[in-house]
Amino acid sequence: MMSGTLEIEDVFTAYDKADVLQGVSLKVEPGRITCLLGSNGSGKTTLVRSILGLTPSRLGRIVFDGADITRLPTHKIIAAGIACIPEGRKVFPKLTVEENLRVGAYQERSDKVSAARLDEILQIFPRLSERRTQLAGTMSGGEQAMVSIGRGLMCAPKLLLIDEPSLGLSPRLVKENFSIIRSINERGITVLLVEQNVHQTLAISHYGFVLSKGRVAASGTPTELAARQDVRDAYFG
């Protein structure tokens, strides 16, 4: 079996005793791009935080490659092979591009391995190679998005969680970033793509789930989801 399988089993997660996630169950198959669609307030980011151990679930299980990670601390979840590209293109503005990327490999003890990963990332993102000494805070939004994705790849994840990669970007940069996400998946990395941009997301995904009010409201292939009238009414205008 390929690595990167994530299983969410009847998960409830609460803020201030109010359940935001109400029995969410879904499976991210290895080697695929699985998307999680939903409007603001649907529970998408809460689910990402629960997977990462930042907002632990109240009930249910989260299983990664056969191991129960529900109660693990975040650093151990990352060490198990899960990385996250957070919403909002978060970079360290006072660090250079290269320094930002190297932060992603903080758990790797071999300088040789870290250097090899850095070279690979710079091949994926030639623009970052050209600007490796530039302060990340002086870069454009699209370039900062590349830095954020590259930093996530530096830990050689089995599963990459990408939260709202289109947020605040021009249509051209959105298309470019989604092309990069597809190429990352083609390298064998499983992707869970959390998005509101339905058209672009379904175009590159193998399977998807729609979250509404903390529950899975629909699931299926991109073709199946696009054919559903309730999904079309909610997301296709």
Where on the chain are the PLM-derived regions?
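The feature captures the beta-strand-to-loop junction immediately N-terminal to the Walker
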Residues: 37-39
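Helix-to-loop junction immediately C-terminal to a conserved catalytic motif
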Residues: 52
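Conserved ABC transporter NBD signature motif
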Residues: 60-67, 80, 114-118
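ABC ATPase C-loop
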Residues: 152-153
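Conserved catalytic motifs of ABC-family nucleotide-binding domains
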Residues: 156
